[in-house]
Amino acid sequence: MIIGVSGIQGDFREHKWMIEKLGHESYVVRTPEDLEKVDGLIIPGGESTTMIRIMKRIGLFEKLKEKILNGLPVYGTCAGLIVLAKEIENYPQESLGVIDIKVMRNAYGRQVDSFDEMVEIKGFNKPFKAIFIRAPRVDGWGPEVDVLSTLDNHPIMLRQKNVLVTSFHPELTDDTRVHEYFIKMVEEYRK
């Protein structure tokens, strides 16, 4: 099983290391053809408008959307959440629209406002240290979206079928449980 990490822009190396720490092969995805080599894909934190612009320029945007709609498991953190979201409230930009959520970019402040918080996640036996860096806030979600964790009454981890998103950065911790959760999603997809 190979877990892809989008290497277009952002903190992809940290996700790659996390996947390898769990004993799985990782692959940095930079072209539409690379999608054929992976069983699941992580879209990291970074700058969502830059990611989308580059994805469109190299032909990855439409190919990725097609693969996700056909069942490819995908996990987006922070900017990756924005890239996957159906609607961005405070900034007009295109997105893949594959998870029925409405988000506000940078809702938790600027870089200097970064923080971490111990949060409860559905199915986890103890709290998880969630790190928020210029994080988006989810302000609305559809009936098919499962809220897995919240902070101050706003979802911070959600899943809709084969799409998982977090507004925080689990790859910046030593705790592998969120990545393990995604790997289980990929294993289910491969069956």
UniProtKB/Swiss-Prot annotation:
Q: Which residues are involved in binding L-glutamine?
A: 46-48, 105, 133-134
Q: Could you name the active-site residues?
A: 78 (nucleophile), 169 (charge relay system), 171 (charge relay system)
Pfam families found in the cross-reference section: SNO (PF01174)
Domain of life the protein comes from: Bacteria
Q: In which pathway does this enzyme or protein participate?
A: Cofactor biosynthesis; pyridoxal 5'-phosphate biosynthesis
UniProt keywords, alphabetically: Glutamine amidotransferase, Hydrolase, Lyase, Pyridoxal phosphate
A cellular component term, taken from the record's GO annotations: cytosol
EC number(s) in its UniProt entry? 4.3.3.6, 3.5.1.2
The protein's matches in InterPro entries, at most eight in alphabetical order, are given as:
Class_I_gatase-like (IPR029062), PdxT/SNO (IPR002161), PdxT/SNO_CS (IPR021196)
UniProt subunit comment: In the presence of PdxS, forms a dodecamer of heterodimers. Only shows activity in the heterodimer.
Relate the protein's function as given in its record: Catalyzes the hydrolysis of glutamine to glutamate and ammonia as part of the biosynthesis of pyridoxal 5'-phosphate. The resulting ammonia molecule is channeled to the active site of PdxS.
User: What family, per the record?
Assistant: Belongs to the glutaminase PdxT/SNO family.
Q: What is this protein called?
A: Pyridoxal 5'-phosphate synthase subunit PdxT
Gene field:
pdxT
